[in-house]
């Protein structure tokens, strides 16, 4: 570890704006490498302690109004932004990415590692979904007309950029398969982790279900609302995203659905710990939120695809629903309510995703590559 701390390290990420799973991974990397500098297209990370006294270098996009507020609009400029960064003085460059930041250019002697949350979704696996759910407002028609005409060249750039890292780390087996499919690169899996020991645990559950996350289309808040409008059961939904979708779904919700607009992590953890079950309807590349729920002793009802298959153990820490619709979800909720779960076993399973494991595995990986 002493060797590593003597190296000059840069951590590159796509953008720092909202706080989600990728940002939690970034935070843990910064704890592991307290002297690392940050490179990112835009930074609106607020006053979090982890960024205090830290060198943070942003791209030209930071100074362009409108673009600096919309990472979707800025996607056309990010390849240039990341290729413009001067990383020539760094010994190790680590990109934590689901988009373009893997495309930074380094010197031949620099060890460049990509921690990949997913190959760029809007170029590859979820291209058609993104086309159909653009959030450009009045510019949506232009985006839908333009994107099909330029996506081929963007895919070529993304594929070329995927050859720049010396090594890939995948955040899940699910992501590793995508990295192989779209980039033809091998990767080693190191799971993202949470500070499990500091997540409150409770054996006592109350009569409500719970879901939280950013209120954006692929997180499937609409599925939750449709299912619970139908079944009439109590659910609390927490989000930090006050947008058009949030307001539309809140208006559509029946009285059994309680919306909570909050950034308060302590409140979120408390809601996790008291819920009878946490719902997880999206197909995620990995998904840290179900781990937070399980750490609190709460079982998970998850869509049976993607990263949830690597974290939730059916019948022990939760159950899966087979189709991404309200009929399948409600059928599984009815099945879940006839089951019994051991909160202690659920918590113990979550401990395998504690941040100490992430730290150990990442340091071992980098040291091994330095020896090569």
Predicted features along the sequence, with ranges:
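Active-site donor-binding segments of glycosyltransferases and PAPS-dependent sulfotransferases
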Residues: 35-102
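A charged, aromatic-enriched C-terminal amphipathic alpha-helix characteristic of glycosyltransferases
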Residues: 80, 324-327, 337-369
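Membrane-proximal helix-turn-helix segments that form the acceptor-binding/catalytic region
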Residues: 135-168, 176
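Conserved donor-binding/catalytic core segment of Leloir-type glycosyltransferases
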Residues: 200-219, 225-238
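Nucleotide-activated donor-binding/catalytic signature segment of Leloir-type glycosyltransferases, i.e.
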Residues: 246-266
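Short alpha-helical donor nucleotide-sugar binding micro-motif in glycosyltransferases
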Residues: 270-275, 362
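Acidic donor-binding loop of glycosyltransferase active sites
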Residues: 273-285, 298
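Short hydrophobic beta-strand element within catalytic cores of glycosyltransferases
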Residues: 299-303, 312
């Amino acid at each position: 570890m002493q060797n590593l701390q003597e190296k000059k390290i840069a951590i590159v990420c796509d953008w720092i704006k909202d706080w989600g799973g990728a940002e939690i991974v970034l935070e843990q990397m910064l704890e592991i490498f307290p002297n690392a500098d940050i490179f990112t297209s835009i930074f609106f990370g607020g006053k979090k302690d982890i960024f205090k006294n830290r060198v943070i270098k942003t791209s030209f996009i930071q100074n362009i109004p409108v673009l600096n507020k919309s990472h979707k609009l800025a996607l056309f400029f990010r390849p240039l932004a990341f290729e413009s960064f001067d990383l020539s003085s760094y010994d190790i460059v680590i990109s934590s990415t689901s988009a373009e930041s893997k495309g930074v250019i380094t010197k031949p002697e620099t060890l460049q590692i990509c921690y990949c949350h997913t190959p760029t979704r809007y170029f590859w696996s979820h291209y058609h979904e993104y086309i159909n759910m653009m959030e450009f407002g009045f510019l949506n028609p232009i985006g839908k007309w333009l994107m099909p005409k330029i996506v081929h060249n963007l895919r070529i750039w993304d594929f070329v950029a995927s050859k720049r890292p010396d090594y890939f780390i995948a955040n899940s087996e699910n992501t590793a398969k995508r990295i192989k499919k779209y980039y033809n690169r091998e990767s080693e899996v190191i799971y993202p982790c949470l500070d499990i020991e500091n997540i409150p645990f409770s054996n006592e559950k109350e009569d409500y279900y719970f879901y939280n996350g950013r209120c954006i289309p692929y997180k499937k808040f609409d599925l939750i609302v449709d299912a619970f409008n139908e079944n009439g059961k109590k659910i609390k939904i927490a989000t930090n995203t006050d947008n058009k979708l949030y307001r539309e779904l809140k208006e559509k919700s029946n009285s059994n659905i309680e919306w909570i607009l909050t950034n308060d992590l302590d409140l979120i953890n408390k809601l996790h710990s008291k819920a009878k079950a946490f719902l997880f309807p999206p197909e995620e590349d990995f998904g840290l939120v179900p781990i937070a729920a399980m750490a609190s002793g709460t079982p998970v009802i998850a869509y049976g695809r993607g990263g949830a298959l690597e974290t939730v153990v059916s019948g022990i820490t939760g159950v899966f629903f087979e189709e991404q619709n309200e009929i399948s979800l409600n059928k599984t909720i009815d099945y879940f309510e006839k089951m019994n779960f051991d909160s202690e076993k659920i918590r113990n399973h979550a401990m395998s995703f504690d941040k100490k494991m992430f730290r150990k595995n990442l340091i071992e990986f980098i040291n091994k590559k330095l020896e090569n």
